[in-house]
Amino acid sequence: MAKRKNKELLEIAQEIGGEEAVEVVKALEKMKEATDEELAEATGIRVNTVRRILYMLNDEGLADFKRIRDPETGWYYYYWRLETKKLPEIIRSRKMAELKKLKEMLEEETSEIYYWCGTEGHPKLTFDEAMEYEFQCPICGKMLMQYDNTHIIEELKRRIEELEIELGLKKKPRKTSKKKKSRSE
C-alpha cells in the first residue's frame, strides 16, 4: 500500500477507534487476512474490542470479511481483510463532511457577537445570553467583555480554503510577484 494511503488509513482508524484501532489495522495489513481471534493474539487487544473495531471499520467500508463454516463443529469463522479500494472516496466524503461542519462553525462565529469574562474554561456567551446574566459571568461573576474571535474566524477561513483546494473545489491562489521597474520608466 502506498505510504500516503497507509497514513490516511491509519488516521481514519485513529478517529474511529483510537490507538487500538491503529494496532488492529497495522496487524491486518501484515497478515493480509485474519480472524478476530488471530488479530487479538497478534495485537494483545481483547477479542471483543477487536471485533468492535472490525465492525466499525466495516461500517466505514475499510474492512471486509468472508464467513466460512467449519464442517466438523458447524461454527462460522470470519476472516477479515482491509478493503482500501474505496479509501479515496471515503477520504473525500469525510473531508466534505468536515468542510460542511467548518462552514457552519464559521457562520456561527461571524453571525454573533460573543462575550466572555476572560477566564480559561468559562463559556463564551451570545449577546442575548450575556443580557440574561446582566453581563456577568455565570460561573465566576466577573464582568463580561466582548470576545475577540477574529483569530478563530481567520483559522476557520484558512482551514476551509485548504480543504476546498484539497477537494478541487477551489484553485490554489497564485503568489503575486512584484514587478521590478525598468530603468527607462
UniProtKB/Swiss-Prot annotation:
Keyword DNA-binding applies: yes
Transmembrane segments annotated in the record for this chain: none
Keywords: DNA-binding, Transcription, Transcription regulation
GO biological process: regulation of DNA-templated transcription; transcription initiation at RNA polymerase II promoter
InterPro entries for this protein: TF_E_archaea, TFE, TFIIE/TFIIEa_HTH, TFIIE_asu, TFIIEa/SarR/Rpc3_HTH_dom, WH-like_DNA-bd_sf, WH_DNA-bd_sf
Pfam annotation, one family: TFIIE_alpha
Domain HTH TFE/IIEalpha-type: 5-88
UniProt free text on domains: The winged helix domain is involved in binding to DNA in the preinitiation complex.
PANTHER family on file: GENERAL TRANSCRIPTION FACTOR IIE SUBUNIT 1, TRANSCRIPTION INITIATION FACTOR IIE, ALPHA SUBUNIT
Role this protein plays: Transcription factor that plays a role in the activation of archaeal genes transcribed by RNA polymerase. Facilitates transcription initiation by enhancing TATA-box recognition by TATA-box-binding protein (Tbp), and transcription factor B (Tfb) and RNA polymerase recruitment. Not absolutely required for transcription in vitro, but particularly important in cases where Tbp or Tfb function is not optimal. It dynamically alters the nucleic acid-binding properties of RNA polymerases by stabilizing the initiation complex and destabilizing elongation complexes.
Name of this chain's protein: Transcription factor E
Organism: Thermococcus kodakarensis (strain ATCC BAA-918 / JCM 12380 / KOD1) (Pyrococcus kodakaraensis (strain KOD1))
Lineage of producing organism: Archaea, Methanobacteriati, Methanobacteriota, Thermococci, Thermococcales
